[in-house]
Amino acid sequence: MSSSTISAMLMGAADGDLNYLNSTPIGSSLLDDMGLDEDDFQSSSFEVFIPESYDSKFMSDYEYISKNANRFMKCKSREYAIQGELLKFFIIVRPPDDSKKRQKQQQIQQLLQQKQKQILINQSNTSTPPPPQKSIITNSDSPRLIVSDTTSTTKIEEQQPPPPPPQEEQQEQDSITVLQPSTSSSSNLLFELQLRLASDYEKSTKENQNPLNIIDYNPKHSFVNTEMKNDHISSSKSATSYLRQNTLNVNNNKNNKNQNNNNNNNIENSNNTNSRFIGDVVEVSSPFTFKDTSNPYQKPNFFRLSNGDLVFPIEVPIYIREINEDKLITMVIKINRPKNNRNNIASSDNKLERLIQGGAVDKSVNYTMRTSTASLGVGGTIHNNKVTRTILKNFTLIQPMKVLLQSNTTIGCKNLICVSLENTHPTSNITIKSLDIYLFHVLNMESTTIIDSVSSVSSIPTHRQIGNLVKVNEHYVISNLSNHRLPIELEPSNQYSMVLSVEPSSIQKTLQPTEGFHTKVELSWHIPCSSGQVLSLYELRAQNPPFTTNLMISTDYKSPVILNEKFLVKFNISNLSNSLKNLTINIPPSIIKQNGSSSSNNNSKLSSTNSGQTSDNPINSSNGGQSIKKQGSNLSLNRQQSSTKLNNQSNNNNNNNANTTNQNNLNSSRYIPVETTIQFSELSNKSLLSYEEIQRNSVNLLCLEKSVHIGPVNSKNSISASIEFLPLSVGIFEIQNITLYDSIEQITYSLKEPLQICCVSREHNNEEHNNNNKENNNENNKENINNNNNIINNNNDNNCNENNNNCNENNEEIK
């Protein structure tokens, strides 16, 4: 039987769902499965079973559960819950032994009655006289029983016990299976789950106070069934389902539901969602689905084991406030068994006691019992109209995924976001599936949902929902600058870091008037001990996209570049103004100085980026490792009114060069400065030659074209131009004072931020490629070794099987 034919649905179960049984005759075949009657409910023991490792088939496949039903006897539960997960567990009801024997006898009687009816039907069809019904011998699969008819009464006597079976057959008989549910299986138990802080709940029970609610109605971590797309957030994130306690407004809710039925479907759905959105009672559901086509109101929520135990599968989201992480949480499970005609008939009480109980005054009896485990307590209350039990399950709330975000690093208009991920779980690995960035308008970030209050008639806004999304691709370009790509797997106590680049696009669109943007960093991850994946949303403040009405430039070049090899820097120029521009790019001819760090330090930092870890310096982390397109940041321009033309600009550059050369005597003179460590006798031709070499290498980056005429650029259009550079030394260098001159309006535009170029030697580049090739080869070799081992094991197994078969054949021949 497939998993889609079995059901256990707790969501929305109510007393009215079982009203169809009130008019059903007692002798009908729909009453062949009693469920859990009142006597068994009071005397049974309850146990909460949370599997240590999640198995999807054990939660959804009926046949797989039946084959592994022995796991319900030796229950090894985990003592922790993960923040944001969909916790799937089982509540096992273990009736007493007397009840189990009574149920077996009832099943035997039902089997006999069914076989007698089948025999009578077969005899009537063949028109033959019925044989004397002195004894009925059942098949080997059914129990061996003899039915004798004396004095109009039926007595059931067992035959003599057969000889004890061998040990193998005894083990097969001891194995537990899942019984197939009958068509009358019904949910005669209702569950209410409350999550409380353990210390607060224990204090509230002693002082008769209500414990504080720790549910987070706008959770930071939530469970999602499907992966998120880039243009929306899953509805399960913005519509978290919670039940409210409807003890005071039951009649009002029924009237509201009747009124909603006359309205449109959209209004009906929204009202239904709001009516059960807030409260201390968490809505629970179960993965099984089974419904009788003839009875649409049927909602069974359990399955029975062959030993007589009942199993109720339940799933509940763990959405708890972040302040309660790493603390002991108490899950309070209140079990209600509402009475109806069917339950009264199933009870062992006589009619007189039921009538007296129905007309008696309200009275309750409280009782409490403790199980063998310290973390599980059972209590109960018996009322005249329903019976309740309470189960307490303690667990520790953990969050194994620790995330650290740093976004205070900017290069031009580009925001560099450093993301550090850490797996704090001691034993399980974490698989990080995706990491994305979503932008929100501040004014639409939080929207309130109006719901009905519990204690008063008026409605109050209590829930905050996530606001509307801004399409990221229209305003920003997001890229991952790290070497490794997702998904990745983090082992216990391991860390992983990456750098995300967020930069505005060259062609901007009109934005809605807002104060700014909120950024959500979305991280989806999976852990083997939990079901599905967890979606974590972290808030991050981003800068507003720079808006200009003149020019915007973005650069594209290879990084790192190879020593003594020419490379191109591509300038993409967008004319955002309403007028025509005739542009020329000017590169300053002065000596381009090296950045603050020395070349040896740069080489050490570059080598540290090969392991996938990013350092605190965003320049090294973004430029090391591999060739990245659109590496340069989008650079905005300052408009400068100038009365001089292009020639004056070159004169200014020469003056600046003169100032820099005056500050450094080595650049303007060939005389060596006298220092305390240098003696005049040491001056020789060799020292002068070494000085000339240093002087020549001070030009670290050489531009082969000082000026490039771009030409006319129409309004709202873009154009690109490439300029060649030649690196002469290893390090990280800056290209400063790049200007654009508009000959029509005679305006000079200068770039705010310099371009940064990283240059490495060919040997260093070859080492990186060799290391990457070695890693790939090692992984391939491991896979090949594993495959070879599997092939060898399979061959050995086949050889062993063949040898065993040959031995068996030889033994038979000898016999």
From Swiss-Prot:
One of its GO terms (cellular component) is nuclear pore. Residues 595-611, 640-668, 783-809 have a biased composition (Low complexity). Residues 765-782 have a biased composition (Basic and acidic residues). It comes from the Eukaryota. Residues 135-154, 174-183, 612-639 have a biased composition (Polar residues). Residues 123-183, 249-274, 592-668, 765-815 are annotated as: Disordered. This is Putative uncharacterized protein DDB_G0279765. It comes from Dictyostelium discoideum (Social amoeba).
